[in-house]
């Protein structure tokens, strides 16, 4: 009898259906706030295969550079001697973090990088690319010159490059950061050109930290400097101005009055001009090159 009961129990247990509880992530309405969120920079089909390969790598490296600058700032804040050097001693780190985070994570579905010279400007001497203007505020043309002159982040600190003595646009990453901040959806009409050269950038940090955190080249020099120091040659970098840091330099600092903004607004606005090379430019994308204080024309 016991044997018969055992057989019946076994047969029932094998045949019994298994109930599985399944958790569904999607909301009942079908709404997904992450849908169509584009974090990478779109490239137009006008770029051929080799152009696409170079530009896509450059765009990825620019985001990598921005990501590290953001993370360095989150890790150390104003305790970082690099942060104080480029943005002053009395500056909150939140805005700097935000500018770099926009490059990393903001939606880029409206942005487009193209290789067709739609406005016939790549023929101009020295033009490696250009922003198309306010009527195409999220479009950037990359000219042929970029593809034969730009370097990659793996080459940082090589071939005589130093942060303080070399141009910021030698590398795809540095050049593209500059171009990103011209885009309305990334720069948000906040980031401008108040200081250009390394020396001017350091001066701006001490005279007007409010402008420094919104100065294109301050952000780019900072990103290159901390990447070189943290990643390329850890603990050493390749600044080139003879400055070295100890571990303790990242843990504390003495307050200084030199970070004050007092009386600096007029200096920054008058001494660091951002002008188009074509004064008759209109909003429908005439020349958007600009001449830096050292005479360099950036396109």
Curated annotation (Swiss-Prot):
Query: Where along the chain is composition biased (Polar residues)?
Result: 278-288
Q: Which GO terms describe its cellular component?
A: cell surface; extracellular region; fungal-type cell wall; hyphal cell wall; hyphal tip
Query: What happens in the null mutant?
Result: Impairs hypha formation. Protects the fungus against leukocyte killing in vitro and in vivo, impedes the innate immune response to the infection, and increases fungal virulence and organ invasion in vivo. Prevents utilization of host zinc and damage of host cells in the absence of exogenous zinc.
Q: Does the keyword Signal apply?
A: yes
| Signal peptide coordinates | 1-15
One record GO biological process: adhesion of symbiont to host
What single Pfam family name could you report for this chain, choosing any that match? HRXXH
Q: What induces it?
A: Differentially expressed in response to changes in the pH with aximal expression at neutral pH and no expression detected below pH 6.0. Expression is controlled by RIM101. Expression is also increased during adhesion onto human epithelia.
Where is the protein localized? Answer: Secreted
- Residue segments, region Disordered: 253-299
Q: Where is the composition biased (Low complexity)?
A: 259-272
**What Gene Ontology terms describe what this protein does at the molecular function level?**
fibrinogen binding; high molecular weight kininogen binding; integrin binding; metallopeptidase activity; zinc ion binding
Task: Report keywords, A-Z.
Answer: Glycoprotein, Secreted, Signal, Virulence
Q: Which family does it belong to?
A: Belongs to the ZPS1 family.
What protein am I looking at? pH-regulated antigen PRA1
- Gene name in the database record: PRA1
């Amino acid at each position: 009898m016991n044997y018969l009961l055992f057989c019946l129990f076994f047969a029932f247990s094998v045949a019994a259906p298994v109930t599985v509880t399944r958790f569904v992530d999607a909301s009942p309405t079908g709404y997904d706030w992450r849908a169509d969120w584009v974090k990478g920079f779109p490239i137009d089909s006008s770029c051929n295969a080799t152009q696409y390969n170079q530009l896509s790598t450059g765009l990825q490296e620019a985001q990598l550079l921005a990501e590290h600058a953001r993370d360095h700032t989150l890790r150390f804040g104003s305790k970082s001697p690099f942060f104080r050097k480029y943005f002053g001693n009395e500056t909150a780190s939140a805005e700097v973090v935000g500018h770099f985070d926009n490059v990393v994570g903001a939606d880029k579905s409206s942005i487009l990088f193209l290789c067709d010279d739609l406005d016939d400007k790549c023929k101009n001497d020295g033009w490696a690319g250009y922003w198309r203007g306010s009527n195409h505020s999220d479009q950037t043309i990359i000219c042929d010159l970029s593809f034969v002159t730009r370097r990659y982040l793996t080459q940082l600190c090589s071939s005589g490059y130093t942060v303080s003595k070399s141009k910021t646009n030698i590398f795809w990453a540095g050049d593209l950061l500059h171009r990103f901040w011209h885009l309305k959806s990334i720069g948000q009409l906040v980031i401008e050109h108040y200081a250009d050269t390394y020396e001017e950038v350091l001066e701006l940090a001490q005279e007007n930290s409010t402008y420094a955190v919104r100065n294109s080249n301050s952000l780019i020099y900072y990103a290159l400097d901390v990447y070189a120091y943290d990643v390329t040659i850890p603990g050493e970098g390749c600044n080139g101005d003879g400055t070295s840091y100890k571990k303790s330099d990242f843990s504390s600092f003495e307050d200084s009055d030199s970070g004050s903004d007092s009386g600096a607004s007029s200096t920054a606005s008058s001494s660091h001009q951002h002008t188009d090379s074509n004064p008759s430019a209109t909003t429908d994308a005439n020349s958007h090159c600009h001449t830096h204080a050292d005479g360099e024309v950036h396109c």
